[in-house]
Each structure stands twice: as C-alpha cells, then as structure tokens.
Swiss-Prot record:
Residues 80-134 form the Kazal-like domain. The keyword Secreted applies. GO terms for molecular function: brain-derived neurotrophic factor binding; calcium ion binding. Residues 250-336, 340-425 form the Ig-like domain. Keywords: Calcium, Disulfide bond, Glycoprotein, Immunoglobulin domain, Metal-binding, Repeat, Secreted, Signal. Residues 173-208, 225-247 form the EF-hand domain. Ca(2+) 2 binds at residues 225, 227, 229, 231, 236. One of its GO terms (cellular component) is extracellular region. InterPro entries: EF-hand-dom_pair (IPR011992), EF_Hand_1_Ca_BS (IPR018247), EF_hand_dom (IPR002048), Ig-like_dom (IPR007110), Ig-like_dom_sf (IPR036179), Ig-like_fold (IPR013783), Ig_sub (IPR003599), Ig_sub2 (IPR003598). Residues 42-54 have a biased composition (Basic and acidic residues). It is found in: Secreted. This is Follistatin-related protein 4. Glycans are attached at residue 317.
Length: 841
C-alpha cells in the first residue's frame, strides 16, 4: 500500500488511534503536565527533530536540509518533481502517554495528536483539562455500528463495482465490499490485520459523524478479535461486518427422505457456516414457523424440521434457507411409504364343478405392492396351467373350470418394502345335490340384498341386479313407510299422477340408504336388508344434498329453505348406521351454499375436517366434523374465486377448488389448497372444470358440462402434481365414475356420460387411450334437474364391481366395464334422478 496515497485521503475518527510504530519527536515523551510557555519551545524543537528524522541518506539531506516541517509531518522528496515536501507521518511509535487535545479528544501520545492535526489540517494542541481523561475511550456499540457503515460507504466510493456488473443480492454485494476493504487494510498481505495496519486507517473530518462516539478502526480488534490473538482474520472480519459465509455441498442441494407412514421424522438443513442465522423452513413456498401446526415444528436449535406423525398428506417438497440468505436453498423431498392394505373378493364362494371362478385381491401401498397367492399354504405360481392363471399383475386368480380339488383357502399376500398384508378368499366346490347351508345362504340370501343398484325414479324405488340384468324389487309410490305408515310418495291433491321427486342419496355402510325428498321436506331411510323404507326424518325445507361422514357415522343435510335459496341451512343426522333413534342437529353455519367432506379409502380411514362454502363469501371454511365447529377461514379473495366444488387427494394433501364461472358458457378455473398449511397455493395450472379424484388418490380428472376439455393429472410418489394430457370432448361431460382396471392391477379407468349425446366415454387414465360405447338411447331431455346434480347420472359398482349404470329418457343402461361393452337395457323406468350401489352386506 502506498504511503500518502490511500491513507491521507481518509478522515480521522472520533477517538485516537492506538499507539503504533512510527516517527516520534522528542517532545512526544514530555509530561502532559507542561507549564505555560513551553508550547513555543516545544514547537521549535519539533521542527528540529523533524528535520533530523527526515535525513535517512546524504542525498535526501541536501534536498530537505533547509525544509522545515511542522509537528506530525516529515520531509520527503516528491517522486515526480524531486522537490522536497512535507507529508504527514504515516505512523507513530507505540508508546502510550495519553494526552488531551484541544479538540476534546484523547490521544495515545503527543505524536498521534500532532499527526492528527497534520492530517486534518488544523491546529490541535495539548491541554491540561481532565475532561477527556475522565471520558476515556467512549466507543459505544451504536458508534461502533456507525463506524462500520462509514467504512463500507467510503470503500464503496473508493472501489465501486465496474459498470456492467450483474446485479447481485445485497448480501453478496456486501461480502465483496468487505473483502475489498480487508485486502486494502492488509498492507503486508499475510491475511491478518494487526493493530499497526488498522491504525493507519484514519478518517477525514468531513467523513466524520458525531454518532461515531469516539470509535476508530482499531476498535475492530477490541470488539471482534474472537480468539484474542491481536489480529483479525478474514473470517473475523466477515463476522465484524455481519457477513455470513454459508455453504451447501452440491450433493446436498436436493435431499430425498423416505419415511414410513405413522412414524416421526426429522429433516436437517445442511446449510453450514459460522454464526449461521436462524433457519427458515417452507412448504410449497409458505413459511412454516408461524403457522402453529400441530404435527410440524422447527423449534430445534439446530434448525431441523420435526414432523411428529407422518401421513401421506405430508409428502412433497420442503425447503430451508438461512434468514436473509434466500439465494442459498436446500430442497428436501419427503417420500412417504405405506405398508400394503388389501381387500379380497369374495370372502367366500361356492361353485359347482365345471364352472369358472375368480378370486380377486386389491392392494394399495407405496411403493406398489407385489401380490402372491397361496392355496392352503402352497404357492400357486408353481401350479399354473390352462385352467389356473393369474391376471392383472396377479390381482386376480382365475380358474377356468373348477374341480372338487380346487376347494380350499386361497391367501392373497401383498408385500412392499415396508410391510405385508394378507387375507383369505375361500372357495367351495359342491354339486347342487350336496348344497351346504353356507352354500345356500351365500347363493340366495347374499344375492337377494347385496350387490344391487338402487334407482330412485319417478315411479318409486327400483332395485336392479346387474348380473341377471333384471329388476329384483320395485317399491311403488304407494308403498307405506314402516314406522309412520305414510306413503313413500303421497299424491298431491289435484294431480292425476303420483310421481316421486328425489334429490340426493347416500349409502350408509351397506345397511341403509338415506335419500332426500325436497318437496316433502324429509329424508327417507331405506333398510337394505328388508328392502323396505324404514322411516322418514323431517328436516328443513327443500333438502337437496346429502353426504355421509363415515368417520363419525353422520349424514349431513343441506337444505335450500326456499326455491330462491334465501334461507339455506345445514343439519346433521347422527348415528346414521343404527337406522333408528338418530338425532338431528342444526349446525351454526348461516348462508351455506355447498359443502364438502373428503371420502375415505383403504389408506385413509378417518377424516377429521370438512369444508363449507357461503353464497357471497370468496372463501372456504374449515369445520371440525366431530364438534361441528368452524375452525378456520381460507380466503380466496385474492383470486376472486367463489368456490363451487371441491375434491381432495391424500397424496400430498391437495384440495382442488373449482371456482364459479364468469359467464354461463365458460368453465370455472381451479385453485390448489395445501391441507398441511391450510394455505392457497394458487391456480392449478390452467386447469378448469369440476375436479374428480380416483379412489387411490393418484389421478385427478377435471371436466365440465359446458366446456369441451377433459384434463387428466397425476400425483407422483413425491407428492408432485403433473399434467398427463388434455383431451377435447364435444359436447361437455355430465357425470364421471372410476373403475378399477381389469388388466392392470394398480390402474384405474374412467367412464363419463356426455351431456347431450347418448354415447358413453371410456378412458384409460394411465395411457390416455380413449373410446366410446355407442348404441345407448337418448339421454334425459328437458331443463337441468330442479334440485341440482348431473342431468345424466353415472354410477359404478364399487371396488370389485364390473358394472356401471346410467339412465336414458325412459330406461336404464347397464355397462360391463370388464368387457367394455353394453350389458343390457332395463325398460320402463322414467326420470331416474339418483342411483346408489349397495355392495355385499
């Protein structure tokens, strides 16, 4: 570093620099208790000392011999002109003889006082006042902070960033500035700043600020020499200026953590650095620290994220960064493994020799389980033949022609990396002459009440068995309700006919069906076992929507109040599966326009929360299904979204919200809500329409009866939503149903009714392969259903069912999904408003 180049251009700070090595005149060693009159003599001797100290060589003596320099300076030859000139002393010798200056500051010795006077270009003399001695070194923390800001400001003016330098973060710019300042101060380039080097840095008067409070660069050693070795390293210099050096190994940029559902896990942030600021954790861009989540917290001092009980909703991406350093981010991908959960069908069956028999096993888990079959404990894969085969990735065991020796207990075993599950399907082979009681019960009683479609039409309730393709039972409008002896559909005075009006219906554990009769302000309870209407429950006027909360055994009832929907209400029927003795509870929610209760599945068997929508409020309201109390409001106002429908997938915990259309002919956009944080993530890409989620939570199909597009998305094992494809469908979709694939054990297919055409749409979700089933009759005509719902309903037949049912104008059509073909038409049934499938009882 050049003497007289950088340092003389800086200003003197409030307190004196510590005593450092330099030129010292004789007067500097004098006692501060100087008597009056000694100042002039002292100044004369100072000239003489300066002249002698400026004669290091004979050549210089000739040039500076007649050049007199004042205190605090010495004679030097100008390198350009060769002429002698007086320049301020660079440093003073390290001798501590404190002296008060006439400027009110305390100096380490007389040399430093005179050097400061030289640098500042003003007269400063020693005084005998004790004030500055009593004040001592008054560098406060506030002044020290101000000093560091002044040093950085001066450095930025001295060495500005070159033009064209890319704009960087403030933290990065500050780091470069501090590095530059350290390099300039490190005169000997040894990577350590000593007291001598810091003492050379003085500030000019115009750069001084009263708020510095007597602080000097030497105070860097006093405050930030952490190892007390008398020097500052670059690391200590970084710390002094609060420049944090953080690092993240390239291999840690993305960290994948796999944990089994139900366990706890800890995500540790791999960002390292001395004095690292607090770690901030985010999920889907939302900070987790202040949300008060019951199952996630980051209170650990090590900056880790703790998830106390992992479920599939927790899967997805989590990020961590140090506070104020958002440019350095680590991503944690949380994958959740789920042990297999299986169901077999049928649990027991009896067949006669020579007929075909199938045993089916459905398994869900993450990763996808592998299925094997045992017969009486022996692996059947070693017995494969033309008569015995495994279909759909082993999920179906098919016997082409059964024999007596095929009788046995067939065990389905599903395995994946984290667990195993098994169940037994029993097969009995007996001829008709040797029927056992169990055989008779299975064949006759079982088929008489279970595995049926219950159709609610204008002329009553029709029970249809899909295998026989015939009506098993018909409950006419004049049938009596068992407990009240009222008619199912009483005749209105003056009407010649007695049509039934139905709205919504739900299956309650394959025991009862609850169905709404809006015009009669009641809900009927149908006993599946007896195939009779058991009772009626009076509810608020115009009940139009029912939903069964299986987790709490409750049926929720939404009523309009009147045809203008001006007095809507939400009621709950408790203990629904008992069939009688239920209680009707009125909820406290006003202005309800719609509600949503997520369905259960094999993996998620308990639901805690539901959601309600208000007529004029751009928000969804989270409700505790057990206490029936509102918990939280999730505002959609920022997106101008009035919610119309919702769907949910447990994979990643996403809610899909359909917003109302802007115009009668447009389709409503969708928003995504994260169920972990109850926060809106934003639009679901450019997806529009009503969302439908497959039973396993993997596929999301969005359709509309007004728009031409069908969108298919998939949730990956990492909890990420990706769009698979978009299909253009004309006209729009009326209703949609899912059916388990009969060729791929882990896949689902979708069927959809068209709003204005008789065809039935078929879609293989994983591949996008699409087809149409034709030869169906015209769909129901006329205006949209009075009580809401699709114009042309479509109902599947459960997890193992292969049939679907949809109405035409005056008939019903049954479709065999396994063969992807029309099964039959059941004529003479008009105005089918809703359909319920009842599985095995």
């Amino acid at each position: 570093m050049k003497p007289g180049g950088f340092w003389p251009h800086l200003a003197l700070l409030g307190v004196s620099l510590p005593a450092v090595l330099g030129w010292m005149d004789q007067g500097a060693s004098r006692s501060p208790n100087m008597v009056p009159g000694e100042s002039q003599a002292e100044e004369t001797r100072g000239f003489e000392v300066t002249r002698r100290e400026g004669l290091p060589s004979p050549g210089l003596s000739a040039s500076c011999g007649k050049k007199l320099c004042s205190h605090g300076s010495r004679c030097l030859l100008n390198r350009t002109t060769g002429q002698p000139s007086c320049q301020c002393l660079e440093v003073c010798r390290p001798r501590y003889m404190p002296v008060c200056g006439s400027d009110g500051r305390l100096y380490g010795n007389h040399c430093e006082l005179r050097r400061a006077a030289c640098l500042l270009g003003k007269r400063i003399v020693s005084v005998h006042s004790k004030d500055c001695f009593l004040k001592g070194d008054m560098c406060t923390m506030a002044g020290y902070a101000r000093l560091k800001n002044v040093l950085l400001a001066l450095q930025s003016r001295r060495q500005p960033l070159p033009q064209g330098t890319p704009r960087q973060s403030l933290a990065s710019q500050k780091r470069l500035l501090v590095e530059s300042l350290f390099k300039d101060l490190d005169a000997d380039g040894n990577g350590h700043l000593g007291s001598l080097e810091l003492a050379q840095y003085v500030l000019k008067e115009q750069d001084m600020d009263g708020s510095l409070n007597r602080c000097s660069p030497s105070d860097l050693l006093r405050f930030d020499d952490y190892n007390s070795d008398g020097s500052l390293t670059l690391g200590e210099f970084y710390t002094a200026f609060q420049v944090i050096q953080l690092s993240l190994a390239p291999e840690d940029k993305v960290s994948v953590t796999t944990v089994t559902v139900g366990l706890s896990t800890v995500l540790t942030c791999a960002i390292r650095g001395d004095l690292r600021p607090p770690i901030i954790w985010k999920r889907n861009g939302l900070t987790l620290s202040f949300l008060g989540l019951e199952d996630i917290n980051d209170f650990g001092e090590d900056g880790s994220l703790y998830i106390t009980k992992v479920t599939t909703v927790h899967m997805g991406n989590y990020t961590c960064h140090a506070l104020g350093h958002e440019q350095l981010v680590q991503t944690h991908v949380l994958q959740v493994n789920v042990p297999p959960v299986i169901r077999v069908y049928p649990e027991t069956q009896a067949q006669e020799p020579g007929v075909a028999a199938s045993l089916r096993c459905h398994a869900e888990g993450i990763p996808l389980p592998r299925i094997i079959w045992l017969k009486n404990g022996m692996d059947v894969s070693t017995q494969m033949s033309k008569q015995l085969s495994l279909l759909a990735n082993g999920s179906e065991l098919h016997i082409g022609s059964v024999r007596y020796e095929d009788t046995g207990a067939y065990t389905c075993i599903a395995k994946n990396e984290v667990g195993v599950d098994e169940d037994i399907s029993s097969l009995f082979i007996e001829d008709s002459a040797r029927k056992t009681l169990a055989n008779i019960l299975w064949r006759e009683e079982g088929l008489s009440v279970g595995n049926m479609f219950y159709v609610f039409a204008e002329d009553g309730i029709v029970v249809i068995h899909p295998v026989d393709c015939e009506v098993q039972r018909r409950l006419k409008p004049t049938e009596k309700i068992f407990m009240s002896y009222e008619e199912i559909c009483p005749r209105v005075e003056g009407d010649a006919t007695q049509p039934c009006q139905w709205a919504s219906a739900v299956n309650v554990r394959n025991r009862y069906i609850y169905v709404a009769q809006p015009a009669l302000n009641r809900v009927l309870v149908v006993d599946v076992q007896a195939q009779k209407v058991l009772q009626s429950i009076g509810v608020d006027p115009l009940p139009v929507k029912l939903s069964y909360d299986k987790s709490h055994d409750q049926v929720w009832v939404l009523s309009w109040g009147d045809m203008h929907k001006s007095q809507p209400s939400l009621q709950v029927i408790t203990e629904a599966s008992t069939g009688q003795g239920q209680h009707l509870i009125r909820t406290p929610f006003a202005g309800v326009d719609n509600f949503f209760i997520p369905p259960t599945n094999l993996i998620i068997n308990h639901i805690r929360f539901g959601f309600i929508f208000n007529k004029t409020d751009p928000a969804v309201h989270k409700v505790d299904l057990e206490t029936l109390m509102a918990l939280k409001t999730i505002s959609l106002r920022h997106y101008g979204c009035m919610p119309q429908a919702m769907a949910h997938t447990h994979l990643g915990g996403y809610f899909f919200v359909q917003c109302q259309q802007d115009t009668p002919t447009s389709t409503g956009p969708q928003l995504l809500i994260d169920s972990v944080t109850d926060s809106v993530l934003g639009p679901n890409s450019d997806i529009t329409g009503t969302p439908h989620v497959s039973p396993d939570g993997r596929f999301i199909v969005s359709v509309s009866n007004k728009g031409p597009w069908l969108h298919v998305q998939e949730v990956t094992v990492r909890g990420e939503i990706q769009t698979l494809y978009d299909l253009k469908i004309n006209p729009g979709i009326s209703d949609l149903a899912f059916q388990h694939s009969f060729t791929e054990g882990s896949q689902y297919n979708a069927y959809a009714t068209l709003d204005k055409e008789p065809d039935l749409l078929f879609l293989e979700l994983s591949t996008g392969k699409m087809g149409r089933l034709k030869n169906l009759k015209e769909p129901p005509r006329g205006p949209a259903p009075t009580w809401g719902g699709p114009r042309r309903v479509l109902r599947d037949s459960g997890l193992f069912g292969q049939y679907l049912l949809t109405p035409a104008q005056e008939s019903l059509f049954l479709v065999n999904g396994r063969q992807n073909a029309l099964r039959c038409e059941v004529s003479g049934i008009k105005g089918a408003a809703t359909v319920v499938w009842v599985g095995e009882v």
